[in-house]
Amino acid sequence: MGYNCINKKDLSGKVFTIPTNDANPYIKLHANINKPITAMTMCQRFNSGLERGQTLFSLATKSADNELMLYKSSLGTYRVHVRLRSLDFFNLPDGINEWISLCWTWDSKTGLTQLWLNGKRSARRVISPHGTITGEPSIVLGQDQDTYGGGFDPNQSFVGDVTDVHFWDKVLSPCDIKYYMHGQIKSPGNLLNWEALQFTTNGKVFIEKSDFIC
C-alpha cells in the first residue's frame, strides 16, 4: 500500500505502521529546507517489538549517505551519525512494545549533541563541530540510506509504529523538549511538521490511529 501526499497533511492522532521486516517499506519525507543545516532537533515517538538494531531517522545528501542518521543498536544503546562521523550513547531508558518519546539535538557551533528518551536526557557529547549539512536532502523513515534515496538493508529496517515526527533547524530548549515528551508541542517543526507533512510511502506502510494518548 502506498500514500503519495503532495499537499501537506495533518497526521495528528495518526501513526505510520510498518509491519514487515524487509527493505521494501519506507516513508519519504519532503522537508522545507532551503539553507544549510548548522543546528537541529529531531523528535519522534516510536513503538517496536524488535530487539535487533533498527534505523529511526535517515537524512542523506548526494555527497554523503549519513549526513544525519539515528540508529537504535540494541535496547538502551543508540548511535548518532553526523557528517559521516558516529558515536554511541549507552544505558538510555528504553523499552520493547511500548511508546518511546525521543528527541535528538546537535549544534555545529560546538558539536554538542544529546539524546532525550521519555523525559530523561543523556550526557552531552561532541560530534562534527563546525560541520554544515548542505545540498538537497533525502529524508527517510524506516530504512537506512546507504546511497542517496536507496541502498536499504533489511537487517537495519524499522518495524513498528512511528508518530509525531518534527524537525527544527535549531536546538530546542530543555523545557520545549519536556513539553514534547508529555505529548505537547509549543511550536511545530519548521523543517518537518507532523501537523502539515508532505510525504510518500513505499511498500507496506499504513496510516493508523495513535494510542499514545487516549
Across the structure, where does each feature detected by a protein language model lie?
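Extracellular glycan-associated modules
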Residues: 1-214
